């Protein structure tokens, strides 16, 4: 995943005992829909003119994201590339996509941090973590 690659790169110039990895307690919900003719016209001459879709996102805490997926009747599946659960559903003229930060994805990150014997882990944003997160962190970090 991305964290593993980032740590590998950082370790080329920073000793493991000086490196702290940051992990998120939030996830982003992405919404993508085709651009209108007006939006294409407004984007003319900019880099955005090359993209056929309008994209926006919003942040959700771990528990809120799980509730949202459930309320939409969507199913999650494991994305081995990102090491996250993923869901998508259609609505409002477009597609909603979410790669979840949850205890499963967090554990994958903590395994990489422990394997590389890093100095520690930093989490953000406090208050957005799901239940069971701190017990999981204590299993991997002293």
Which residue stretches match the model-derived regions?
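Active-site region of glycoside hydrolase catalytic domains
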Residues: 1-35
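Glycan-binding loop/region signatures in secreted carbohydrate-active enzymes
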Residues: 23-112, 141
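Aromatic-rich peripheral "rim/lid" segments of glycoside hydrolase catalytic domains that contact
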Residues: 81, 112-115, 127-142
């Amino acid at each position: 995943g991305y964290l593993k690659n980032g740590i590998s790169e950082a370790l080329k110039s920073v000793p493991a005992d000086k490196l702290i990895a940051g992990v998120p307690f939030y996830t982003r919900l992405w919404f993508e829909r085709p651009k209108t003719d007006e939006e294409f016209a407004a984007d003319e001459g900019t880099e955005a003119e090359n993209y056929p879709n309008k994209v926006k996102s919003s942040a959700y805490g771990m528990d809120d994201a799980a509730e949202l997926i459930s309320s939409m009747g969507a199913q999650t599946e494991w994305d081995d590339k990102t090491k996250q659960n993923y869901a998508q559903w259609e609505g409002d003229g477009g597609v909603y996509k979410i790669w979840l930060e949850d205890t499963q994805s967090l554990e994958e990150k903590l395994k990489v941090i422990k394997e590389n014997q890093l100095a520690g882990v930093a989490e953000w944003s406090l208050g957005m973590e799901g239940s069971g997160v701190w017990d999981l962190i204590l299993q991997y970090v002293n």
